[in-house]
Amino acid sequence: MRSYIKPGLVPLVPETGRKAPGGGRLLIVTPIISGRLTPDEAIGLETLRRHGGDWPRLLLHPRGLTFAFDTTGFATLALDPANFEGISAYNAMMMSAWFYALFEGYEHILIFQTDCLLLSDRIAPWLDRPWSYCGAPYFRRNGELKSVGNGGFSLRKVADHRAVLNASSASLGRISVPMARQYLKGTYLRYLLGHLAKGGGAAGLVADFDRAEDEFWIYYAPLFSDRFRLPSAEEVVGFAAESRPRRVVELNGGRLPLGAHAWMKHDRAFWDETLASLDR
């Protein structure tokens, strides 16, 4: 999600004390704001039903929402509607300690937004990897891989995310090479230095953060916890695609990744061909 948050203007309503039902290695979480699916969203949820196996699935939605589609196979969890009022509220929610506390009974959550595809049932091997966060890789303008990336289809270790958000201090000694490259642009460095000057831990940085939530997890979260580990861009070409899906498949040895995000926006012709071939 390439969107921006206006600090202090997002009226989140923390859902403390709430818990997602059940527990285990993985919960697939689909945030949803409308009770009606578009045709493309219906395709995406059908791939989740087809390849999601027996992994538990949850629709996370505003309180009072009525579903006009079949929700068989999904548990539901209603939150205050303020937490879904626009992309800014969503980004802020995804950087909130109370959000990950909802899933404390699970080792991982797989965020599967309604514009995602699940292309394989091989989810379990990714749960065995040591990483805290996996998302579709970002590319540089010249087509080179940049970093692990987008949060729309992302695997997250719940305990590691909670450790970051509860951290009281950051350490510059944890800066990785990809993080350092971003800091050289200036904007990220100003955020970091400004935060370190004020203190306040991860909660303080999040309160002033005006970028998309996945950028927080990629470029800042590792500074707050030694346990928060990220894969390289090369290591996630098998996990997901967003932009440049053909290039992702090429880099993955000609194989489709586990999933995709924003598939209708990036090379739709490729995905139409791919979905048709999977249906045969």
Kindly label every feature range from the protein language model.
Residues 106-117:
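Short beta-strand-to-loop acidic/aromatic patch adjacent to the donor-nucleotide binding site
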Residues 1-46:
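N-proximal low-complexity "stem/linker" segments adjacent to membrane-targeting elements
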Residues 43-55:
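Short, acidic, metal-binding catalytic loop of nucleotide-sugar glycosyltransferases
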Residues 60-107:
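Active-site-proximal specificity loops/subdomain of glycosyltransferases
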Residues 117-148:
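Conserved donor-nucleotide/metal-binding helix-loop-beta segment in metal-dependent transferases, i.e.
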Residues 153-280:
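Catalytic core and acceptor-binding pocket of nucleotide-sugar-dependent glycosyltransferases
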Residues 54-62, 134-136:
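Short, hydrophobic beta-strand segments that form beta-sheet elements in well-ordered domains
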Residues 69-70, 120-123, 165:
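Short glycine-/acidic-enriched loop or helix-start segments at secondary-structure transitions
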